[in-house]
Amino acid sequence: AGRHEFHSIMIIRHGKVVAEGWWAPYCRELRHTMYSTSKSFTSTAVGFAVTEKLLSVDDTVISFFPDQLPDTVSPFLAMMTVKDLLTMSAGQVPDPTGRISTSSGDWVKEFLATPVLKEPGTEFLYNSMATFMLSAIVQKVTGEKIADYLRPRLFEPLGIEGYDWEE
């Protein structure tokens, strides 16, 4: 436990909160940064979009961004699918997240310009930019930002409110 910083604890039994507590200075009303939890929300948005027949997990990534492709599209980039992004097996080695997320350029264009050295779908490599690309794809096919798209489909039905979503 020494390596973890706990802010709260909640015990749920039979679907009801039976106990909860917070360590100062944290409290129920304080918003917490969720970091990689957003990956779960993004993949849920992809699932809704698939259900609504707006996209398929077998769609190629490049099909969504014809105006942002590099001059030369490698065979591996051409075969990268939504499923490869979901499973973090896009084939980019090393993970381009740090380089792209600190740039001031077009992140989609930079992701697509990153060399795909491994066949997509064959090797897992943690890649937060893959989640960013999923978000960009959902925004492209729905015309809405992820939080706006999820609001009526997920957040409101579950009573999730008061959230901030970094764009």
Regions found by a protein language model. Name each.
Residues 1-26:
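A short, well-structured edge-of-sheet supersecondary motif
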Residues 28-29, 92-167:
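Catalytic-site signature segments of enzymes, centered on catalytic residues
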Residues 6-8, 57-58, 97-98, 165:
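Surface-exposed patches in mature extracellular/periplasmic domains of secreted proteins
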Residues 2-4, 25-26, 56, 76-80, ...:
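Extracellular/periplasmic catalytic domains that process cell-envelope and extracellular macromolecules
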Residues 35-41, 77-80, 125-132:
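Aromatic- and histidine-enriched alpha-helix N-cap/loop-to-helix transition segments
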Residues 33, 52-90, 113, 142-167:
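Active-site helix/loop module of the DD-peptidase/beta-lactamase fold
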Residues 16, 90-91:
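Solvent-exposed coil/turn segments that connect beta secondary-structure elements
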Residues 15, 32-58, 85, 134-138:
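Active-site SXXK
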